[in-house]
């Protein structure tokens, strides 16, 4: 099925790194800076509230922060621009790579595959994540949707990635966790796809698309 693959493209959040794990660290840091008097169980409870309202990272910051301000009755809250900037600047400094992800990238690189990264999100935030993770050098290209104005699942961002590496859809494999943004988007661009199912989108497998529980399983389904 994947005999002619030359390039493998990856999503980042919840494919290679645990967004929830990284966000938990950010929540703790945020509360320490803005609410230093809140400690112990009270701090944990507020971190839980931050996690519960972020919608897995798919809610816009412009919608998220007003919700938190209202929930907490935060009378002296900074303005929205300040809070959005805090998120985009500081969240990316916390990265929790998923088990086996870095080792898998290195193994694929050693096999001679070209590696690409295609991730949705704010440019500063996502680029900071890649730098914090220390994996940028493993990739032959990386594109953040915000940098080119095209967001997954629009096929344009996948076509941009393939053009950058000089490969055709038949020579390209996309690996991601989101059944629409990653899998349907890649298929719409003519690419092959593998769905990494960590359980967030249970029951949303795409017929004919291989499913793995961890990116390391890709090594078993690729020749070589």
Give a label for each model feature.
Residues 1-8, 21, 36, 102, ...:
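Asp-based, Mg2+/Mn2+-dependent phosphohydrolase catalytic module
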């Amino acid at each position: 099925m994947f005999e002619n693959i030359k390039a493998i493209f990856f999503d980042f959040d919840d494919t290679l790194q645990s967004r929830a794990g990284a966000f938990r660290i950010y929540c703790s840091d945020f509360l320490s800076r803005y609410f230093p008097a809140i400690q112990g169980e009270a701090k944990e409870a507020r971190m839980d509230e931050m996690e519960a309202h972020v919608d897995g990272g798919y809610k816009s910051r412009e919608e998220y922060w007003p919700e938190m301000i209202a929930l907490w009755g935060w009378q002296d809250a900074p303005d929205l621009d300040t809070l959005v900037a805090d998120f985009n600047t500081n969240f990316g400094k916390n990265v929790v790579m998923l088990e086996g992800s870095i080792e898998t990238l290195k193994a694929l690189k050693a096999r001679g595959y070209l590696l690409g990264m295609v991730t949705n999100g704010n440019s500063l935030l996502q680029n900071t994540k890649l730098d914090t993770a220390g994996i940028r050098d493993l990739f032959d290209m990386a594109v953040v949707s915000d940098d080119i104005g095209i967001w997954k699942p629009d096929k344009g961002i996948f076509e941009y990635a393939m053009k950058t590496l000089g490969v055709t859809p038949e020579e390209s494999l996309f690996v991601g966790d989101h059944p629409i943004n990653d899998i349907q988007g890649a298929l719409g661009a003519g690419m092959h796809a593998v769905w990494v199912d960590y359980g967030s989108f249970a029951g949303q497998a795409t017929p004919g698309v291989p499913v793995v529980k961890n990116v390391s399983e890709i090594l078993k389904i690729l020749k070589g």
